[in-house]
C-alpha cells in the first residue's frame, strides 16, 4: 500500500519498494514524537520503484525519488502529496464520500494517465506491489517525484518567489513538531513520528 499523506514532508519507502538508487552524501535523522525515545540516525535517502495496477488492469511502474529508506522496517509506504504535486502532477485526494464531485485520483501528463485512489479508512492510497526485474524493464513508468533537484519543502514553499529556491544542503535533519496537525504517523514499531525537514 502506498498511502498519501498531506502532512508528510518527504515520502517513505516500505518493503514493497524496489530500490533504484541511493542519494549519495545525504542522510537523515528521524526524531520520534516523544523525547524519551532516541532519534534514528543515518536514514538513507533513496529512489525507488513500485508496481501499480489500475482498475482497468493497466500496469505501471511508479518512480518515487528522494524518499526515506524504511524498506526493511515498515510494510506500508508513504507518498508525500506536495512532493508529488511539485512535479506538476494533479492530486485529487478529497474522498468522494466527502465530495461526490471529487474524481479521487492522481492525474499525470495533463490527465492522459489517471491513477484511481482507493481508501483505507480516511487514508487515500494506491495499491502497489514489489516489481519484478521484468516489470522494471518493460512496464511503462510514471515519475511521481523529481530526481533533478534536492527536495526541501520548507525552502520551496516558504519562499516568496520560487526563483529564490536554493538547493538543499548535503545533510539535513528530520525533526518533530508537537503542534496539532503536524502529527505524522509512520507505522514503524507502532510508534508515531512527526517528520519535518529543518
Descriptions of predicted regions:
Residues 1-2, 96:
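Beta-strand elements of modular eukaryotic interaction domains
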Residues 15-26:
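A glycine- and small-aliphatic-rich helix-loop capping segment at beta-alpha/alpha-beta transitions
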Residues 8, 17, 83:
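Catalytic histidine site
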Residues 24-29, 39-198:
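Aspartic protease core domain of the pepsin/retropepsin superfamily
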Residues 2-7, 11-13:
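Short hydrophobic beta-strand that contains or immediately precedes a catalytic carboxylate
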Residues 12-16, 87:
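Short hydrophobic alpha-helical segments that form membrane-spanning helices or hydrophobic packing faces
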Residues 32-35:
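Acidic/polar residues in short coil/turn loops that connect beta-strands
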Amino acid at each position: 500500500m502506498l498511502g498519501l499523506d498531506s502532512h508528510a514532508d518527504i515520502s517513505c519507502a516500505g518493503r514493497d519498494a524496489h530500490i533504484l538508487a541511493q542519494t549519495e552524501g545525504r542522510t537523515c535523522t528521524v526524531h520520534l514524537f516523544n523525547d524519551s525515545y532516541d532519534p534514528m540516525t543515518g536514514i538513507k535517502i533513496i529512489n525507488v520503484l513500485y508496481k501499480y495496477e489500475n482498475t482497468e488492469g493497466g500496469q505501471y511502474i511508479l518512480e518515487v525519488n528522494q524518499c526515506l529508506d524504511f524498506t526493511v522496517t515498515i510494510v506500508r509506504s508513504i507518498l508525500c502529496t506536495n512532493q508529488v504535486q511539485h512535479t506538476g502532477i494533479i492530486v485529487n485526494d478529497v474522498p468522494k464520500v466527502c465530495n461526490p464531485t471529487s474524481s479521487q485520483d492522481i492525474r499525470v501528463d495533463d490527465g492522459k494517465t489517471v491513477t484511481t485512489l482507493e481508501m483505507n479508512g480516511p487514508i487515500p492510497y494506491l495499491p502497489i506491489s514489489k516489481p519484478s526485474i521484468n516489470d522494471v524493464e518493460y512496464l511503462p513508468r510514471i515519475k511521481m517525484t523529481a530526481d533533478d533537484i534536492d527536495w526541501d519543502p520548507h525552502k520551496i514553499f516558504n519562499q516568496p518567489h520560487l526563483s529564490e529556491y536554493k538547493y538543499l544542503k548535503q545533510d539535513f535533519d528530520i525533526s518533530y513538531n508537537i503542534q496539532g496537525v503536524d502529527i505524522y504517523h509512520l507505522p514503524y514499531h507502532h510508534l508515531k513520528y512527526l517528520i519535518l525537514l529543518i
